[in-house]
Amino acid sequence: MASQVSQMPSSSPLSSNKDEMRPKADFQPSIWGDFFLNCPDKNIDAETQKRHQQLKEEVRKMIVAPMANSTLKLAFIDSVQGLGVSYHFTKEIEDELENIYHNNNDAENDLYTTSLRFRLLREHGFHVSCDVFNKFKDEQGNFKSSVTSDVRGLLELYQASYLRVHGEDILDEAISFTSNHLSLAVASLDHPLSEEVSHALKQSIRRGLPRVEARHYLSVYQDIESHNKVLLEFAKIDFNMVQLLHRKELSEISRWWKDLDFQRKLPYARDRVVEGYFWISGVYFEPQYSLGRKMLTKVIAMASIVDDTYDSYATYEELIPYTNAIERWDIKCIDELPEYMKPSYKALLDVYEEMEQLVAEHGRQYRVEYAKNAMIRLAQSYLVEARWTLQNYKPSFEEFKANALPTCGYAMLAITSFVGMGDIVTPETFKWAANDPKIIQASTIICRFMDDVTEHKFKHRREDDCSAIECYMEEYGVTAQEAYDVFNKHVESAWKDVNQGFLKPTEMPTEVLNRSLNLARVMDVLYREGDGYTYVGKAAKGGITSLLIEPIAL
């Protein structure tokens, strides 16, 4: 188990007046009520399943079939990915892109093909130099004015730029250049290109959640004159099949959550199990990860309860035995806890015990030990924050950051996400993850810094809480906006680290790395315009509605 910190003495006396010391929490109830308790009483009929299988094989043949040129092949693969069905054809797509990578005739390609090729190859880990874009610059080093009229080319360059790594100045310039010109052009474009551009400016492909983006692209793709009817039909059926699976999972989780009765027992805590499921379905939506999705949703639900216990209700003197109990991970510790803490402590242990039982048949119990240790470290870092709040202690920014990165929970979620995966995950995966590799660090920075900016900008943090933005402003004598700009630069730098982590040879298989990429994507989607988890913003409501409530019309 992780080392204990709860025994560290506090230099500030503790008040015995619990009511005075108790933080004040005021979270809104769930907007979903019991809506997801019951799953629609329907299954995909045998005929539709058979059609799905037939279409799948047709699409597979199309992916590997020779095409007149690489542009057509790249565009088709891009559509397969954009419609959210590439998980069926991982090997075929990889093989085709490998061929395109080695048969390079990029000198003849226009801006559209050069950018599309760059993005798809980078997404799959191939080293493609950003120098391929130099031919679109003039002698002064600026992008040629002639490319500004090529809207589809600009759109692809814009999307490609989000795959940039450190030192690729031309792609930093490209984001600004393409954003400006696409914003100017969008009003004069015809549908569906206007919708593609408008949506891209709000959400890039690289940082969007694949299933959310697929739901949107389905509505756009069918209006593209040259769309592939077989691919479109397959993607629609597949979307509905996966949606039904997700609804069944969420119904099961909602029943578990309702039986815990935390809404009554712990009224101080956020009731966000539906939003938690949406978060985790962003980490992995594919059917083969059903078990992992259900386990990780329960973990994020319990982590949310633990967070609110530390942050929104418990006194510091109550948190010491609570942290001790989590560190010791023993149900016997329950007798040492205040009465209101007992249900959440028991539920926490039950979730991990169930996890152990579910993975035991494959001999994967060792994975759960890593997951427990990650949860223990999270609780320990919460206790440090609680001590700072009690003492009204203002740490230096670096001191704050060292503790704040673990409190965002992303290292814990990344490690726990591996528990429900298949044989691609090994003991080496967990050893690697436990050593805080760069890609997990990067997704954690994205989470922490986006959350910090959001909390300060939208005043989502209690006045007595220690704020990273306030720490930075005080230490460096800057305004709030200047602090936001610095934090956002850290986020952009972390995205470059994520992208770097996918370039071959990778430290771990792509499926392992995808968990950190998708965790970062969730933050970009949910937290760009406020805390979309706690306050259930437009992104969360819209995503949950389109992915879990509304099927695609066939």
Swiss-Prot record:
Its cofactor is Mg(2+). Mg(2+) 1 binds at D307, D311. It comes from the Eukaryota. Pfam families: Terpene_synth, Terpene_synth_C. Signal peptide: none annotated. Its EC number is 4.2.3.13. It catalyses: (2E,6E)-farnesyl diphosphate = (1S,8aR)-delta-cadinene + diphosphate. The keyword Magnesium applies. Pathway: Secondary metabolite biosynthesis; terpenoid biosynthesis. Gene3D superfamilies: Farnesyl Diphosphate Synthase, Terpene synthase, N-terminal domain. GO terms for molecular function: (+)-delta-cadinene synthase activity; magnesium ion binding; sesquiterpene synthase activity. Mg(2+) 2 binds at D307, D311. It is an enzyme of class 4 (lyase). The keyword Nucleus does not apply. Mg(2+) 3 binds at D451, E455. Keywords: Lyase, Magnesium, Metal-binding. A motif (DDXXD motif) lies at residues 307-311. Residues 1-16 have a biased composition (Low complexity). Induction: By bacterial infection. The Asp-Asp-Xaa-Xaa-Asp/Glu (DDXXD/E) motif is important for the catalytic activity, presumably through binding to Mg(2+). This is (+)-delta-cadinene synthase.
